[in-house]
Amino acid sequence: MGLTYQLIPVLVCLLVCTSHFAHGHKCDITLAEIIKTLNILTTRKNSCMELPVADVFAAPKNTTEKETFCRAGIELRRIYRSHTCLNKFLGGLDRNLNSLASKTCSVNEAKTSTSTLKDLLEGLKTIMKEKYSKC
C-alpha cells in the first residue's frame, strides 16, 4: 500500500508548515520562561540579591545582544556556583539565557564596573520584556 503521488506534496507541505510553527514559538516560550523566572527572582527578599557582579550592561556600544546575554550567564554561573542561595532559579535562568547567547564571550573583571545581582536581574527583565513584545 503506497502513497499516491498526489498525497506526497501535501505531506511535505504539512511537515514544513509544522516545523516553522514550532520554531517560531520557541522564542516566545523561552522568553516567557525567562521573564517568569526574573519576576520571581526580583520580588524575592534575599541577601544574595546584594552580591556584587560585573556590570554586563556597561559594555562597549558595539557589543551584541547575544554577547550581553553570554556575559550575564557568566555572572549568574559565578554566583550560583559559589553561593547556595537561589541556585534553582539562577541555574534555570542561566540555561535559558545560554540558548539566546553567543557561544563565547569574556567578562574582564579588572576593567568592568560592578553592580548588584538585583540590578543585573532587573536589567535583564527590562531587555527580555522588550524583546518579548517584538517576538
UniProtKB/Swiss-Prot annotation:
Keyword terms, alphabetized: B-cell activation, Cytokine, Disulfide bond, Glycoprotein, Growth factor, Secreted, Signal
Q: Which residues are glycosylated?
A: N62
* One of the protein's GO biological processes: positive regulation of macroautophagy
The cysteines joined by S-S bonds are C27-C135, C48-C85, C70-C105
User: What's the chief localization of this chain?
Assistant: secreted
What is the top-level taxon of the source organism?
Eukaryota
List where in the cell it is found: Secreted
Q: Which GO terms describe its cellular component?
A: extracellular space
Which first-to-last residue range defines the signal peptide?
A: 1-24
Under the heading PROSITE patterns, the entry gives:
INTERLEUKIN_4_13
In its UniProt record, a GO molecular function of this protein is: growth factor activity
Gene3D superfamilies xrefs: 1.20.1250.10
Per its database record, what is this protein's job? Participates in at least several B-cell activation processes as well as of other cell types. It is a costimulator of DNA-synthesis. It induces the expression of class II MHC molecules on resting B-cells. It enhances both secretion and cell surface expression of IgE and IgG1. It also regulates the expression of the low affinity Fc receptor for IgE (CD23) on both lymphocytes and monocytes. Positively regulates IL31RA expression in macrophages. Stimulates autophagy in dendritic cells by interfering with mTORC1 signaling and through the induction of RUFY4.
Question: Family assignment?
Answer: Belongs to the IL-4/IL-13 family.
Instruction: Give the protein name, as stated in the record.
Output: Interleukin-4
